[in-house]
Protein backbone atom coordinates (compact mmCIF):
# COMPACT_ATOMS: atom_id res chain seq x y z
CA UNK A 1 0.00 0.00 0.00
CA UNK A 2 1.19 3.49 -0.86
CA UNK A 3 1.21 6.29 1.74
CA UNK A 4 -0.49 8.49 -0.87
CA UNK A 5 -3.97 8.23 -2.34
CA UNK A 6 -6.05 10.00 -4.98
CA UNK A 7 -9.76 9.76 -4.34
CA UNK A 8 -13.13 11.08 -5.40
CA UNK A 9 -16.68 10.80 -4.13
CA UNK A 10 -19.68 10.44 -6.43
CA UNK A 11 -23.26 9.72 -5.38
CA UNK A 12 -26.36 9.76 -7.55
CA UNK A 13 -24.54 9.67 -10.88
CA UNK A 14 -23.62 13.35 -10.76
CA UNK A 15 -20.20 12.88 -12.32
CA UNK A 16 -19.07 10.52 -15.04
CA UNK A 17 -15.92 9.48 -13.20
CA UNK A 18 -12.72 9.92 -15.19
CA UNK A 19 -10.27 7.02 -14.92
CA UNK A 20 -7.04 7.99 -13.17
CA UNK A 21 -3.46 6.83 -13.30
CA UNK A 22 -0.57 8.18 -11.25
CA UNK A 23 2.53 6.16 -10.39
CA UNK A 24 2.96 5.47 -6.68
CA UNK A 25 -0.55 6.58 -5.76
CA UNK A 26 -3.48 4.39 -4.75
CA UNK A 27 -6.90 5.22 -6.18
CA UNK A 28 -10.37 5.11 -4.61
CA UNK A 29 -13.89 6.20 -5.50
CA UNK A 30 -16.53 6.48 -2.77
CA UNK A 31 -20.07 5.93 -4.08
CA UNK A 32 -23.39 4.31 -3.23
CA UNK A 33 -21.84 1.07 -4.51
CA UNK A 34 -19.23 1.15 -1.73
CA UNK A 35 -21.09 2.96 1.07
CA UNK A 36 -24.79 3.13 1.87
CA UNK A 37 -26.17 6.67 1.44
CA UNK A 38 -27.21 8.31 4.70
CA UNK A 39 -28.82 11.50 3.44
CA UNK A 40 -31.59 12.04 0.89
CA UNK A 41 -29.30 14.67 -0.62
CA UNK A 42 -26.66 13.08 -2.86
CA UNK A 43 -24.52 16.19 -2.54
CA UNK A 44 -24.07 15.72 1.20
CA UNK A 45 -23.61 11.97 0.80
CA UNK A 46 -20.65 12.70 -1.47
CA UNK A 47 -19.23 15.58 0.52
CA UNK A 48 -19.02 13.60 3.73
CA UNK A 49 -16.21 11.56 2.15
CA UNK A 50 -14.75 14.59 0.40
CA UNK A 51 -14.37 16.53 3.64
CA UNK A 52 -13.51 13.75 6.13
CA UNK A 53 -10.65 11.62 4.75
CA UNK A 54 -9.24 11.17 8.27
CA UNK A 55 -12.25 8.96 9.04
CA UNK A 56 -12.03 6.78 5.95
CA UNK A 57 -8.40 6.88 4.79
CA UNK A 58 -6.52 6.58 8.07
CA UNK A 59 -3.83 4.32 6.63
CA UNK A 60 -2.63 7.04 4.26
CA UNK A 61 -0.50 10.05 5.15
CA UNK A 62 -1.34 12.14 2.09
CA UNK A 63 -4.58 12.44 0.13
CA UNK A 64 -5.57 14.31 -2.99
CA UNK A 65 -9.30 14.74 -3.44
CA UNK A 66 -10.49 15.51 -6.96
CA UNK A 67 -13.97 16.01 -8.36
CA UNK A 68 -15.20 13.05 -10.37
CA UNK A 69 -14.88 14.98 -13.62
CA UNK A 70 -11.21 15.88 -13.00
CA UNK A 71 -8.22 13.95 -14.29
CA UNK A 72 -4.62 14.03 -13.13
CA UNK A 73 -2.20 15.16 -15.85
CA UNK A 74 0.81 16.35 -13.83
CA UNK A 75 3.25 15.12 -11.20
CA UNK A 76 1.34 14.89 -7.91
CA UNK A 77 4.45 14.09 -5.89
CA UNK A 78 5.89 17.42 -6.99
CA UNK A 79 2.64 19.21 -6.14
CA UNK A 80 2.28 17.69 -2.67
CA UNK A 81 5.93 18.22 -1.81
CA UNK A 82 5.62 21.88 -2.76
CA UNK A 83 2.33 22.83 -1.13
CA UNK A 84 2.25 20.54 1.91
CA UNK A 85 5.80 21.40 2.92
CA UNK A 86 4.75 23.97 5.52
CA UNK A 87 1.03 23.26 5.94
CA UNK A 88 -1.34 20.29 5.97
CA UNK A 89 -3.98 21.57 3.54
CA UNK A 90 -3.92 23.21 0.10
CA UNK A 91 -6.55 24.38 -2.41
CA UNK A 92 -6.74 26.40 -5.59
CA UNK A 93 -7.90 29.97 -5.02
CA UNK A 94 -11.20 31.06 -6.54
CA UNK A 95 -9.61 34.45 -7.04
CA UNK A 96 -7.30 32.93 -9.66
CA UNK A 97 -10.19 31.65 -11.79
CA UNK A 98 -10.15 33.50 -15.10
CA UNK A 99 -13.89 33.26 -15.71
CA UNK A 100 -15.28 34.06 -12.26
CA UNK A 101 -12.64 35.39 -9.87
CA UNK A 102 -13.96 35.99 -6.35
CA UNK A 103 -12.11 36.47 -3.08
CA UNK A 104 -14.78 36.15 -0.43
CA UNK A 105 -17.55 33.77 0.73
CA UNK A 106 -19.85 36.77 1.06
CA UNK A 107 -19.30 37.56 -2.65
CA UNK A 108 -19.86 33.93 -3.55
CA UNK A 109 -23.09 33.82 -1.56
CA UNK A 110 -24.40 36.99 -3.18
CA UNK A 111 -23.55 35.64 -6.64
CA UNK A 112 -25.54 32.47 -5.92
CA UNK A 113 -28.50 34.48 -4.62
CA UNK A 114 -28.44 36.91 -7.56
CA UNK A 115 -28.24 34.08 -10.10
CA UNK A 116 -31.13 32.27 -8.43
CA UNK A 117 -33.28 35.41 -8.45
CA UNK A 118 -32.48 35.96 -12.13
CA UNK A 119 -33.36 32.36 -12.98
CA UNK A 120 -36.59 32.67 -10.99
CA UNK A 121 -37.76 35.42 -13.34
CA UNK A 122 -36.88 33.37 -16.41
CA UNK A 123 -38.29 30.02 -15.26
CA UNK A 124 -40.67 30.62 -12.33
CA UNK A 125 -42.20 27.18 -12.80
CA UNK A 126 -38.98 25.63 -11.45
CA UNK A 127 -39.46 27.36 -8.12
CA UNK A 128 -36.59 26.91 -5.66
CA UNK A 129 -34.75 24.67 -8.14
CA UNK A 130 -33.62 27.94 -9.73
CA UNK A 131 -31.21 28.30 -6.79
CA UNK A 132 -28.04 26.25 -6.32
CA UNK A 133 -29.06 25.88 -2.68
CA UNK A 134 -31.71 27.10 -0.25
CA UNK A 135 -31.35 30.91 -0.19
CA UNK A 136 -32.59 31.02 3.40
CA UNK A 137 -29.75 28.72 4.54
CA UNK A 138 -27.19 30.76 2.62
CA UNK A 139 -28.38 34.08 4.05
CA UNK A 140 -28.56 32.65 7.57
CA UNK A 141 -25.03 31.27 7.29
CA UNK A 142 -23.53 34.52 6.01
CA UNK A 143 -25.30 36.47 8.77
CA UNK A 144 -23.80 34.13 11.37
CA UNK A 145 -20.31 34.55 9.93
CA UNK A 146 -20.65 38.32 9.94
CA UNK A 147 -21.92 38.41 13.52
CA UNK A 148 -18.90 36.46 14.83
CA UNK A 149 -16.49 38.77 13.03
CA UNK A 150 -15.43 36.73 10.00
CA UNK A 151 -13.90 39.39 7.72
CA UNK A 152 -14.75 40.15 4.12
CA UNK A 153 -12.15 39.63 1.38
CA UNK A 154 -10.46 36.92 3.42
CA UNK A 155 -9.99 34.53 0.51
CA UNK A 156 -12.17 31.92 -1.21
CA UNK A 157 -11.24 28.36 -2.12
CA UNK A 158 -12.41 26.26 -5.00
CA UNK A 159 -13.24 22.74 -3.87
CA UNK A 160 -12.44 20.78 -7.02
CA UNK A 161 -9.04 19.67 -5.70
CA UNK A 162 -7.84 19.34 -2.10
CA UNK A 163 -4.35 18.33 -0.97
CA UNK A 164 -4.13 17.14 2.63
CA UNK A 165 -1.95 15.54 5.23
CA UNK A 166 -5.29 14.50 6.61
CA UNK A 167 -4.36 12.77 9.87
CA UNK A 168 -2.79 15.89 11.37
CA UNK A 169 -4.64 17.49 14.29
CA UNK A 170 -5.18 20.94 12.76
CA UNK A 171 -6.52 19.41 9.57
CA UNK A 172 -8.89 17.06 11.41
CA UNK A 173 -10.33 19.82 13.60
CA UNK A 174 -10.98 22.10 10.64
CA UNK A 175 -12.46 19.33 8.48
CA UNK A 176 -14.84 18.29 11.26
CA UNK A 177 -16.01 21.89 11.60
CA UNK A 178 -16.33 22.19 7.82
CA UNK A 179 -18.49 19.08 7.70
CA UNK A 180 -20.74 20.49 10.45
CA UNK A 181 -21.25 23.65 8.39
CA UNK A 182 -22.12 21.64 5.27
CA UNK A 183 -24.32 19.20 7.16
CA UNK A 184 -26.45 21.83 8.89
CA UNK A 185 -25.91 24.85 6.65
CA UNK A 186 -25.46 25.29 2.92
CA UNK A 187 -24.23 22.32 0.90
CA UNK A 188 -22.12 24.79 -1.11
CA UNK A 189 -18.82 23.93 0.56
CA UNK A 190 -16.96 26.95 -0.84
CA UNK A 191 -19.12 29.14 1.37
CA UNK A 192 -17.86 27.64 4.62
CA UNK A 193 -14.25 26.44 4.33
CA UNK A 194 -12.55 29.81 4.68
CA UNK A 195 -14.70 30.56 7.71
CA UNK A 196 -13.69 27.25 9.33
CA UNK A 197 -10.02 27.86 8.58
CA UNK A 198 -10.29 31.34 10.14
CA UNK A 199 -12.14 29.96 13.16
CA UNK A 200 -9.48 27.28 13.76
CA UNK A 201 -6.53 29.49 12.83
CA UNK A 202 -5.58 26.89 10.22
CA UNK A 203 -2.56 27.62 8.07
CA UNK A 204 -3.19 26.40 4.54
CA UNK A 205 -1.73 27.10 1.12
CA UNK A 206 -3.19 28.19 -2.18
CA UNK A 207 -1.82 26.43 -5.24
CA UNK A 208 -0.78 28.55 -8.18
CA UNK A 209 -3.02 28.80 -11.22
CA UNK A 210 -6.64 28.52 -12.28
CA UNK A 211 -8.45 25.47 -10.87
CA UNK A 212 -9.84 24.79 -14.36
CA UNK A 213 -6.63 25.46 -16.29
CA UNK A 214 -3.36 24.30 -14.76
CA UNK A 215 -0.53 21.85 -15.40
CA UNK A 216 -1.63 19.23 -12.87
CA UNK A 217 -5.35 18.64 -13.45
CA UNK A 218 -7.76 18.67 -16.36
CA UNK A 219 -11.51 19.16 -16.03
CA UNK A 220 -13.59 17.12 -18.47
CA UNK A 221 -16.32 19.21 -20.08
CA UNK A 222 -19.81 17.78 -20.13
CA UNK A 223 -18.97 15.18 -17.48
CA UNK A 224 -21.82 16.04 -15.14
CA UNK A 225 -24.50 13.50 -15.95
CA UNK A 226 -26.89 13.59 -13.02
CA UNK A 227 -28.29 15.80 -10.32
CA UNK A 228 -26.68 16.64 -7.02
Task: Outline where the language-model segments fall.
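Short, solvent-exposed loop/turn segments at secondary-structure junctions
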Residues: 11-14, 34-35, 70-72, 96-98, ...
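Conserved donor-nucleotide/metal-binding helix-loop-beta segment in metal-dependent transferases, i.e.
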Residues: 72-114
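N-terminal anchoring/stem segment of glycosyltransferases
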Residues: 1-62, 184-188, 199-202, 227-228
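Short active-site loop/helix that positions an aromatic residue
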Residues: 54, 77-81, 196-197
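A short acidic (Asp/Glu
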Residues: 16-19, 74-78, 216-217
Amino acid sequence: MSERIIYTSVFGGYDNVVEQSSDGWDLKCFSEETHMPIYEDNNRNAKKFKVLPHRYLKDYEYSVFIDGNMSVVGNLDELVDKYLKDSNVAFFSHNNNYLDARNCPYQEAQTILDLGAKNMKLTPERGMLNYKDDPYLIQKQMTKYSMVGFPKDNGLITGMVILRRHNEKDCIETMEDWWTEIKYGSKRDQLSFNYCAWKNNLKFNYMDGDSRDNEYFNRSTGAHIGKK
